[in-house]
């Protein structure tokens, strides 16, 4: 899969599905989009480097 340098262009739902698809545990409850963007950067964009 292709990991974005700037995941904030994705919708919140898309961010969540990408995280789940890569076995990243989502925080409980509904979070603000930037929480998922941060998770994406830490978990997925970091893997690419």
UniProtKB/Swiss-Prot annotation:
It comes from the Eukaryota. PANTHER family: LAMINA-ASSOCIATED POLYPEPTIDE THYMOPOIETIN, THYMOPOIETIN. PROSITE patterns: LEM_LIKE. SUPFAM superfamilies: LEM domain (SSF63451). Residues 4-47 form the LEM-like domain. Residues 32-36 are annotated as: Biological activity. Transmembrane segments: none annotated. The lineage of its organism: Eukaryota, Metazoa, Chordata, Craniata, Vertebrata. Belongs to the thymopoietin family. It comes from Bos taurus. It holds the Pfam family Thymopoietin. InterPro entries: LEM-like_dom, LEM/LEM-like_dom_sf, LEM_domain. One of its GO terms (molecular function) is hormone activity. Hormone of the thymus with pleiotropic actions on prothymocytes, mature T-cells, the nicotinic acetylcholine receptor, and pituitary corticotrophs. The keyword Nucleotide-binding does not apply. Keywords: Hormone. This is Thymopoietin-2.
């Amino acid at each position: 899969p292709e990991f974005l340098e700037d995941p904030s262009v994705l919708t919140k739902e898309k961010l969540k599905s990408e995280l789940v698809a890569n076995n990243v545990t989502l925080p409980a409850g509904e979070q603000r989009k930037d929480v998922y963007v941060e998770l994406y950067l830490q978990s997925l964009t970091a893997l690419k480097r």
